[in-house]
Amino acid sequence: MLALPKFSYCMKHHYIKFFGTALIILSTVTLFAQTGKGTISGNVVDSLGNSIPFANIQVKKQNLKTTSGKTGAFKLTDVPAGNQQIKVSITGYDQFEQVVSVIANDTIQVNIVLKEQRSELNDVIVSASRRPESLSQTPSSVTVLTAKELNTQSAISPNLANILSYSVPGLGFSTNQTGNSGQTLRGRNVLVLIDGIPQSTPLRAGGRDIRSIDPSVIERVEVIKGATAIYGNGAEGGLINYITKKADKGKSFGGYSQAGITGNLKGDSTIGYRFSQQLYGKTGKFDYLVSGMFEKTGVFRDAEGLVISPEYGLGETKSYNGFVKLGYNFTPKQRLQVMYNYFSSRQHSKYLTKEGVYGQSPAIGIYGKRLGEDEGTRFNHNANLQYTNQQIFGKTDLTANLYYQDFYTIYSNSASFFGSGQSAITSTKKGARVNLNTPFNIADQVPMQLNYGLDLMNDKTAQSLTDGRLWVPNMNMVNFAPYLQASATFINDLTIKGGLRVENINIDVDDFNTLATGANGAGSIAVQGGKLNYNALVFNAGARYSKFKFFNPFISYAQSFSVFELGRVLRAAKSNTLSQLETKPIIVNNYEAGFSSTVGKLNFSAAYYYSTSKLGANLLEVNGTYISQRIPERVYGFEIQADYQVLRDLSIGGNYAQVEGKGDVDDDGNFNGEKDVYLNTTRIPPSKTTVYLKYSGIKNLSLDVNWMRVGNRDRFKTNAAGKYLIGEGPVKAFNLFNVAAVYQVTQPLKLSVGVENLLNKVYYPAISQFYGSNVNYVRGNGRRFNLSLGYAF
């Protein structure tokens, strides 16, 4: 029998010490693993494996959050060990949540696949109330263009006017020119913003505000439809807010490079090229994004290969965009950020315009030397300094902005006045915005938000001729406006909103002389300048009920305030004192009702609106130039939109918008009298239908096909000379097809191909038709391609 060894007391003591020490070490390691900190990293992609940048990733119940980078990569450090629930969200995709087991001193890799969101009601916007809110709580019509949608449309054309016309119901068709005259929103003027900085020049509307920045630096576009005063002067039909990209906080250094070529498929000298470069990252508390873009277009030709008239054309144009955004996080709740953007677009054409015959043959370009200054926007500078504090006191958060905008553009030669000449608009804006938001409960289960603050802006605008003559005098406007918005949610589903804004506007107008009508100053009127003071209290109210997905209704009433086109009134002055001119403001009352619906795979929405103003600003042609017709106006219309998921990889959708407007010339309250008129087509666009098809059934490939139909509008007769006045020419319907294909070659490498006017249709844009003149009877683009290659690193 085997004898077991006998342990001495000393040996037993050593074993006890050994096992005791091991147990302590093991317990310590286990405890540290449970209480230490680890890292979560990974990538955010869509169902095709395409990277999703700027997705918001946060650890629930922890004050930890970050944003995915351009390649979809992200990293969360100092995450407490144990089971942690992460939440990932971004506009356009369903929210994603997952429990992750975090181990101390270790990195957990998580790959996140987001499903494209079919309902827009979960989108979060900031432009409607100047605070984050979901569309399901917004009692108004809103269109949001996500980064993905911008990228798809940019693959066809980087012209923002084109992108928006295909994407926004109620917005007029693009002009295919440098400007956006006639591209109104719901039949009224739209206020365009870049990160809340006004781009529009309502004192002397120049029609250069939609194309005022390059889409490569835009993260998303928010379009608020219907009159609003939330951002101040000029939003009679609504507002368009370009929200610029954020710095990538997922890595210390990264970038995106893109190069491409463009051109027509018929005719020579059409090839152009485009380059853009972005660098971004985060180091400690500092983050940055720097971007540059250069584009040179070739000759633009129509479907028959004819050179499109260079008058305000986009052919042979050089465009530049420089963008910088720097941010510093003092604490997780305090941030200072500075943004600067430079945009310039100038035409250098070797062609002259040869007039067409209205209704018969197009105006085209012929070889020749153009005299005078090159047309285009010389510069558009925008700078914004923003400070945010998510808890400045109590539960109140603060956003404060100082901004600056400087704009200068030159127009083509005009013969509408004696001596002819080229005009230029200059506009400089300086402003401050202070916005506070305080949440609280007014009763059990009744949360409320108070949003309040102050806007201050100085706008100096003038219009001169390049030969030194003054057409519109310097107008120096100071706008001081406190505001208050309140929002309460009852029984979790009924949101009621209301607000007011007090407008205080003072405008100093210099003494000036109107342009002469003959030699030696004949016909010029010396007008004594002075001060114009405007004060108004404007309101908004609305309600939305979001309990049922199949029926989510809203109603709203909103006012806007606008000192619009004062410059046109001044330059057409027939009196020698300011007080004798019609300079009253435009106050618009907008009434709207609509609903959104989700039933299975179908999304559907509709809205009807009706807006009135006692004094409008319908532009009327007199002796070849515009004057403002100050008469009561009514504008009304409706919009419908539908999307349907046919298969997992196939969806279709579309929208239809129609608007009409009338003016009460004799001011008798009856808009259907013999003297009353339809508002011309510079204001009221023809009906517009768009249909899209999206297919992603082939690995790494997405395909988008778009169809647009611009309808008829024929409301006016010719004058005694048998000609149409500007804005009154009949518009005949036309149809266009575009297609975009994006192929993810590798994870960092992407190939994009877009074709505009796929069927090479001969057509005249709406502006070419309603202008009713030989020189403006210009065809739209023939079949054009846009081929680009992008690389993320």
Which ranges hold each PLM region?
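Membrane-embedded beta-barrel scaffold of Gram-negative outer-membrane proteins
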Residues: 397-415, 544-546, 552-564, 582-636, ...
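Gram-negative outer-membrane beta-barrel transporters
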Residues: 608-612, 629-719, 759
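Transmembrane beta-barrel wall of Gram-negative outer-membrane proteins
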Residues: 268-297, 302, 306-350, 442, ...
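Face-selective signature of the C-terminal outer-membrane beta-barrel domain
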Residues: 289, 329-345, 374-519, 544-546, ...
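Short acidic/polar hinge/loop motifs at secondary-structure boundaries
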Residues: 77-78, 162, 197-225, 277
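C-terminal beta-signal and adjacent terminal beta-strands/loops
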Residues: 298-303, 561, 652, 709-718, ...
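A beta-strand signature from Gram-negative outer-membrane beta-barrel systems
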Residues: 215-256, 792
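Extracytoplasmic beta-strand/coil segments of soluble accessory domains associated
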Residues: 161-201, 219
